[in-house]
Each structure stands twice: as structure tokens, then as C-alpha cells.
From Swiss-Prot:
Entry function: Transcription termination factor involved in the regulation of mitochondrial-encoded gene expression. Essential for normal plant growth and development.
One Pfam entry name: mTERF
Organism field: Arabidopsis thaliana (Mouse-ear cress)
A GO biological process held by the record: DNA-templated transcription termination
UniProt note: phenotype after gene disruption: Severe growth and developmental retardation. Dwarf plants.
Record-stated family: Belongs to the mTERF family.
Name the UniProt record assigns to this protein: Transcription termination factor MTEF18, mitochondrial
Name of the gene: MTERF18
Secretion signal span: none
């Protein structure tokens, strides 16, 4: 009864907030209307779709928004509402999949992404439904099946018998029912593969059994799905980082406190922090497992001096000076949370990570600024004050934070770069990620941004197209961007492509014996470019304008 009241309360809240404009049902009758609508849907699914009463009720009682939308289609009257519902359902069949997907825990705003195309009734395709019934029959909470579906849809294309057989094989390894459910919810792909367990999944469950036995010897588990799910999700963090490393499993057995004292979010944040060093995921995981004290380090708030931090890690003064000369835009102050990218921006990430993993992880916690004014730069402070007083303060501060995140320090160079980059912090991050994913190393991207900040003003697809053209049609490598970073700032269709193709045509036809660099071809002003063509032959500019400079004709030139 208590659970029913909770469901009613949840639906009533949705009803009153989202449906405020429709006020067809008086407040005192909302619970009544919801109950009758749930009962009508239950009867509809049970009688017309031949679902078991239990399954029909599960769908009806867990689809709050769909129920609300149904109620809003009818005029409410206490004596006739049940009859109105039945009549409406007779003439206006519901999209049964919509109710189903919401009921298994998928947020209603996302349901449309999962609806099968041109199918409304379970009778048209029972595959997903039958898989859900098999999972539910084993004991999976109905409203948690949506998590499984979103992460691993292949689970739901298997036959019920295959699912049941697979689940029983997990129990044969020595797992209780709730342990199987919690583990599979945490690692959904373990449910894929039919009735037989592959060697990888069997090996995983054997290792998990050993780990859980070690945990349970201290009576650390409550015998319910949520308890097993919570611990399994934490274990999955390390499993995803290096599932084949035997040392990792041994360390997990020895460091039970990691999974009991710290939240999943805390573990993910720490793992993510060390992954940002650009090292292997396995190394990041092992650093935490070998040194669990790291979990107590504050790696977010402390302010650092880049110079001071490098010396703290053992760099000599001459080494620091050399780094500062090559990467001046990284120096000044920053925050410890940005340290991994700061080190990648100066190509010292692997060296410093090796120092940390070789027994010096404590250096992250022992660093402090020498004095309150250490590494404060006046030009930066003045620029920051201007930002604080600007009308677009929030927008600019977010962009500045992005630059600090990728390694730019609190210095005048960073402020100059900031003046030239446009877009939201999210957009800047996406554009930066495109460059990184293309294969340009982190430190070189930062150098490119320092030299040509407007690189970050290009849309992701534009950056991809220009890089593809550079490496494909132009036949050059990404390294050329170090010579000519502004290449990415020019228009591909109206500048880069037509000029390059015209130059290529001139060489092929024998009009020009000189081979110009990409920078010379692209960056030369229009006036100088035309003058160069005229110098080759007075008739060449006319040919350029008629056959190459127009977007309509440039792709048809032979």
C-alpha cells in the first residue's frame, strides 16, 4: 500500500506541474483519476493484449507521464470517468510501446528515441516485451530494465530461454539471485551472448565471485539488489580501465575500503583525473589501487604555481626555464584540477606520472604556494578585472576557464588568446576535441591556439573537412599546421580548395614552373594573388575567375 501511495504521489506531482494549463481534474480527484486510468490500462493490456495481469499492472503503474497524457484527453466526471476511459481506449488505441518503455525506467522525454518505427502494438513485435518478462521473472526490478535497454539493446533481442539459461549459469558459478541481478545491471554486456557463457564473461564472473567472497567474509553486503548494484558499479569502474590485469583484481581484494567508504562518483572522478594525464587507463587504475590514500587528496580546489609545481616534482631550474621559454602561455597560476592537461600542454605528463606511480603520489597533496603573491601576473589580473566588470562576464569567464582547463595559465598571453576566441565553453571544448581526435598531440594543439586563436572559432565539421583536404588532396601531413596554423582559419570552399586546385592546374598545364607552399597559396591576399597570376600570363586571371573561383564550377574543372 505504501508503494502504491508513492506511485500516486509521483504521478500527482507530474500531473499538477506539467498539466497545469489543462486543469480538467479537480485537485481532490487527481488520485482517483490516476487510479482509474491505471486500472483501465491494466485491464486493456490484460484483456486485449493477453498480458498477464501482473505484467499489465507493472506497465500501468510505472508509466506516470503516459497515464497523465491519457487523462488529459478526457473530460473528467467522477460517475462516468471509468466508462469514458474504456470507451476512449476502444476507439483510440494507445501506443503500447510508449507505456512500456516509460514503465521500465526510461525517462518520458527520451522514450521517443526508442519507439519502434511504425509499430504501436505488442502484437506487432513481442521480442523486447518477452525479453523483459524473462528478466523480470528472474527477479530484475521492472523499473530498472530501462537502464539495461539503454546501455545494451542486444540483451532484448535474445529469446527468453536464452536469457534464462544464461542467468542460471551465473548462479551455477556460485552467485545468489540478487548478486546476479546487481552485477548484470552494473555490467549489462554480461547478459549478451545467448545461453552459453563465453570464456571472457565466465572468467569475469569467476574473478567477481572471488572478490565478492572476500568482501562478504566481512559481512559487507546487504542481501538486496541495490546493495549489489552499488558495489558492482564501483568495481566496473576498474574493470573498464583494465579488465585483464591480474594485479588489479588482487588489489581490489586487498582494498575493500575503496568500495565501501567512497562513492561511485568519487571513484570515477579520481580515475578520470589520472586518465587525463594521457597515460593508459590501466596505469591510471593501478595508481589508485596501489595508493588508496589518493582518494583523500583534494585534487580540485588548490591553486598552483606552474613554476612552483614543476620544481616540486623535481625539475631543475634550467629545465623549468627551458619549458617556460617554449611554452610561456602555460605559466602563471592554475588550479590543481587542471594539472593533467597543464602537463600535457608542456609534454611532461608521462614524466610526472611516472614520478607519481613510483611511490611519489604524496607530492600531489604536499604542494602549497610559497606565498600569497607567488606567480601573480599583473597583466592577467587587470584583464580579469575587466572581465568581471563586463556585460558578458559569465560567458567570458567560462571561456577563460576552458583555456585554463586545457593548460593555459593565468598570464597575459592567455588574455590575448581569449579576445580572439568566440563561442561557448562547450563549443570550444568540442572544437578542441575534434583536433585532438584527429591525431594532433595535445601540446601542439595548444601551440596552434596560441599562434592562431581563431582556429577555435571554426565549426567541428569545418575543421574535419579542412584536415581531410590537407592530408588527402593536398597530400601533406598534420605536422604542416605547425608551419601554417592559420590554414584552419581560411574558408575551404571559397579559398583553400579553389586556389590549390588552380595552382595544381597551372603546374600540370606547364604555365607555372614554381611550386608554391600551401601558406603562400592560401594566405596571400586576393590582390597579391591576382597580381601573381598576371605575372605568369596576362590571360591567367580571366581563366581563374571564369573557371575556378566560382563555387558552382570548381568541382567540374578538368
Amino acid at each position: 500500500m505504501f508503494m502504491v501511495r508513492l506511485k500516486f504521489a509521483s504521478i500527482s506531482h507530474n500531473f499538477s506541474t506539467v498539466a497545469a494549463k489543462h486543469r480538467r481534474v479537480p485537485s481532490k480527484y487527481k488520485s482517483l483519476a490516476i487510479g482509474k486510468a491505471q486500472q483501465a490500462i491494466t485491464d486493456y493490456l490484460h484483456t486485449t493484449r493477453s498480458l498477464s495481469y501482473t505484467h499489465a499492472e507493472q506497465i500501468a503503474s510505472n508509466a506516470s507521464v503516459s497515464i497523465r497524457n491519457l487523462i488529459l484527453k478526457l473530460d473528467f466526471s467522477v460517475p462516468t470517468f471509468s466508462k469514458s476511459l474504456r470507451k476512449h481506449l476502444s476507439y483510440h488505441p494507445i501506443n503500447e510501446f510508449e507505456f512500456f518503455f516509460e514503465s521500465i525506467g526510461i525517462d518520458y522525454s527520451e522514450v521517443s528515441e526508442f519507439l519502434p518505427e511504425k509499430k504501436f502494438f505488442f502484437s506487432e513485435d513481442r521480442t523486447v516485451l518477452d525479453a523483459a518478462f524473462a528478466l523480470s521473472g528472474f527477479g530484475f526490478p521492472w523499473n530498472k530494465l530501462g537502464k539495461l535497454y539503454k546501455e545494451e539493446r542486444l540483451v532484448f533481442v535474445q529469446r527468453p530461454g536464452e536469457i534464462e539459461s544464461r542467468l542460471l549459469k551465473f548462479k551455477d558459478i556460485g552467485f545468489s539471485t540478487v548478486a546476479v541481478i546487481g552485477t548484470c545491471l552494473a555490467i549489462p554486456r554480461t547478459l549478451c551472448g545467448g545461453g552459453e557463457l563465453g570464456s571472457e564473461i565466465r572468467c569475469l564472473f569467476v574473478k567477481l565471485k572471488r572478490l565478492f567472497d572476500e568482501f562478504d567474509s566481512h559481512h559487507l553486503f546487504e542481501e538486496n539488489v541495490d546493495s549489489w548494484l552499488a558495489v558492482s558499479r564501483k568495481i566496473r569502474i576498474f574493470y573498464d580501465l583494465g579488465c585483464e590485469n591480474e594485479e588489479m583484481w588482487e588489489l581490489m581484494c586487498r582494498n575493500k575500503s575503496l568500495f565501501l567508504e567512497y562513492s561511485e562518483e568519487a571513484l570515477m572522478n579520481k580515475a578520470g583525473y589520472f586518465c587525463r594525464f594521457g597515460v593508459s587507463k590501466e596505469d591510471a587504475a593501478l595508481l589508485i589501487l596501489r595508493n588508496p590514500a589518493i582518494m583523500n587528496f583534494d585534487l580540485e580546489k588548490p591553486v598552483i604555481s606552474v613554476t612552483g609545481m614543476l620544481k616540486h616534482f623535481g625539475l631543475r631550474q634550467d629545465e623549468v626555464d627551458a619549458v617556460a621559454q617554449k611554452y610561456p602561455y602555460v605559466f602563471g597560476r592554475n588550479q590543481l584540477k587542471n594539472l593533467p592537461y597543464v602537463l600535457r600542454a608542456i609534454d611532461l605528463h608521462e614524466r610526472i606520472f611516472d614520478i607519481l606511480k613510483n611511490g611519489n603520489h604524496h607530492l600531489l597533496a604536499s604542494y602549497t604556494l610559497m606565498d600569497p603573491d607567488e606567480d601573480l601576473e599583473r597583466e592577467y589580473q587587470e584583464g580579469l578585472e575587466e572581465l568581471q566588470n563586463s556585460r558578458t562576464k559569465r560567458h567570458n569567464i567560462q571561456k577563460l576557464d576552458f583555456l585554463h582547463e586545457i593548460g593555459f595559465g593565468e598570464n597575459g598571453i592567455t588574455m590575448k588568446v581569449l579576445q580572439h576566441v568566440h563561442g561557448t565553453a562547450v563549443e570550444l571544448h568540442d572544437r578542441f576535441q575534434i583536433l585532438l581526435n584527429s591525431g594532433i598531440i595535445f601540446s601542439k594543439i595548444c601551440m596552434l591556439i596560441r599562434s592562431a586563436p581563431k582556429i577555435l572559432n571554426q565549426k567541428p565539421h569545418s575543421i574535419q573537412d579542412k584536415l581531410r583536404f590537407l592530408c588527402g588532396e593536398m597530400g601533406d601531413s598534420l605536422d604542416y599546421l605547425e608551419v601554417f596554423p592559420a590554414y584552419l582559419c581560411f574558408d575551404l570552399e571559397n579559398r583553400i580548395s579553389p586556389r590549390f586546385r588552380f595552382h595544381k592546374w597551372l603546374v600540370e598545364k606547364g604555365f607555372s614552373e614554381k611550386s608554391y607552399s600551401i601558406a603562400s597559396i592560401v594566405a596571400t591576399s586576393e590582390k597579391a594573388f591576382i597580381a601573381r597570376l598576371y605575372g605568369i600570363h596576362p590571360a591567367i586571371p580571366k581563366h581563374w575567375f571564369e573557371r575556378f573561383s566560382s563555387r558552382k564550377t570548381r568541382d567540374t574543372v578538368s
